[in-house]
Design a protein with these regions (language model features):
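Short secondary-structure junction motifs
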Residues: 109-111, 191-192
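Helix-start/capping segments and mature chain N-termini
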Residues: 1-88, 92-99, 117, 122-344
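Short secondary-structure junctions
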Residues: 103-110, 245-247
Length: 344
């Protein structure tokens, strides 16, 4: 029997029903973005997706989307690997995203899911002779892993698919069965997240996150040639660690047992943001508490993505137009203030 979810009670689950969707260049009612059971991507996994976040800055009354052009650049590159000709540019998609968010009118953190998939109702495994569909939807969204005191991970028995099987450089719909198998096994065994190894036995990433460790004063993360996603949160974190925090960061392969001996471990991703790991395979990482570098990094990251760090402000795209108003003061002298338009 299907269990109905009470969305008013289930606070950790984002609302499944946005009001609007972006579909092939237009913002339409969400219910209009529906497809048949024989849709090619639904049957064969011939689609790709991206994940972006919007952060509400209450001080400025503004919603900022973090690095949208970079996300859409990778989105378009991934489409090429599936032989898709989308007919849109990263700039076009960014404009469509902003229009969608203005229609939704979110005044809180949200998550945006762009999709490109073969929408033909057709039987037969192939990538040629098909027409892609481009769509987006946005939902209210909080913490992905929901573990403020540290994440417990398990090294999965499932191996990460290699670049010669399904390229890790793209977020392809079908390849995430690999992640789902690992994630569910870990959660059912009492852990919060899974870590996957590649064919060479090296640590790749979490089910949907990149992984970093601190050992002997050096921050280490696997190279993109170890079958990991070229994540923009990963790139952001590397830059913050090096330029803002003054740490040495190197990219090299990581053995499983190195994690057990690490001083700190943390996961990064658009959804997961900065998620410190405090236990791996029932072993404490460091002293079993969130380490100082991960704690500082998490704070800096949240300030950055919400548009509060001037030097990285260019990464944050404001959604709502800002107008300047003149407000009377008690002294009779007018003062200029700013407010966001379209955010009601």
């Amino acid at each position: 029997m299907h269990k109905k979810v009470d969305w008013k009670v289930d606070r950790k689950t984002p609302s499944p029903t946005p009001r609007w969707a972006y579909l092939d260049g237009q913002v339409v009612p969400y219910r209009q973005a529906s497809f048949g059971l024989l849709t090619h991507a639904l049957n064969y996994g011939t689609g790709l997706f991206a994940g972006l976040r919007g952060y509400w800055n209450a001080d400025e009354r503004q919603l900022f989307v973090f690095r949208p052009e970079d996300h859409f650049r990778r989105f378009c590159e991934s489409a090429r690997l599936l032989r898709m000709e989308l007919g849109v540019t990263p700039a076009d998609l960014t404009a469509g995203l902003l229009e969608l968010l203005r229609a939704e009118g979110y005044r809180e953190n949200c998550y945006i899911r762009p999709l490109a998939f073969y929408g033909d109702e057709s039987i037969g495994v192939r990538l040629h002779g098909l027409t892609p569909v481009v769509g987006m939807a946005a939902v209210r969204f909080g913490s992905y892993l929901g573990k403020e005191d540290g994440v417990h991970v398990a090294v999965s028995s499932w191996t990460r698919v290699s670049d010669n099987v399904i390229p890790a450089r793209g977020k392809f719909a079908g390849s995430y069965v690999n992640s789902a198998l690992a994630k569910t096994d870990a959660v059912l065994a009492g852990f919060d997240e899974a870590l996957l190894l590649n064919d060479h036995g090296h640590v790749c990433e979490g089910s949907v996150e990149n992984v970093f460790m601190l050992r002997h004063g050096v921050v280490v993360t696997p190279p993109v040639t170890d079958d990991v996603l070229e994540g923009f949160t990963r790139a952001t974190v590397i830059q913050l660690l090096r330029e803002d925090m003054g740490h040495t960061v190197i990219e090299r392969s990581i053995d499983r047992t190195e994690l057990y001996l690490a001083d700190e471990v943390f996961l990064t991703g658009t959804g997961a943001e900065i998620s410190p790991v405090t236990r791996a395979d029932h072993r404490a990482i460091g002293d079993g508490r969130i380490g100082p570098i991960a704690a500082e990094l998490r704070a800096r990251y949240m300030e950055t993505v919400s548009g509060r760090v001037a030097r990285h402000r260019a990464w944050c795209r404001p959604v709502y137009a800002v107008t300047r108003e003149r407000e009377p003061m008690a002294s009779g002298v007018a003062a200029v203030s700013e407010r966001s338009v379209g955010s009601t």
